[in-house]
Amino acid sequence: MPQKDPEPVHDALADAVLRFVPEGARLQCGPGQLGTALLRRTTVPLRIDTGLLTDAVVDMDKHGMLIDMPSATYLFGTEELYDWADGKPILRGIDYTHDLTRLASREPFVAVNTAIEIDPFGQVNVEGRGEKVVGGIGGHPDYCAAARMSHGGLSIIAVPSTVNGHSPLVDQLSRPASTPAHDVDLIVTESGHADLRGADWSQRRRLITTLFQ
């Protein structure tokens, strides 16, 4: 299945996120338009340690930005991706790809994930709105926790400031939290970021609220 090209907001969001990703880091990101933008727009070589791998990794490799062999649980893309991956030891079981101890060791691990809802303290909901289910929890909490444990790593929640005219910031999540606030280091939008590291609850509220104003 062909990947959907990023829109300008995804490119801007990717550029804002990539400021925090050091050369040689291990990057985890989702399979959507933001993930595609991240892999296409990085200007420093990176390692990929993620759950689902798409065609964007082929583009990354062609431009000399891929270090070592990527690790993933699934492939999802076109024949170009499958041909590129054929014979390579890329795919692993979830017991390997989502292992927090492994992810938190070695090179800095930077997890970049999205959110449907974020509350003023940084709790994240990725599964739906109210009774409407959008998707499963996937590896969201695993990767965020591993990035927090990683020396030099970062857990980043990256979201457009508005989606379909609505802010992802809500007073209260409409579903249970998918990822707890303490596993979120940074919230990044296309126009800025909130650095929550070391912030107490009142500071978190102020930083997050200001970001989405």
Can you say where each PLM-predicted feature lies in the sequence?
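Conserved phosphate- and dinucleotide-binding cores of soluble alpha/beta proteins
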Residues: 1-213
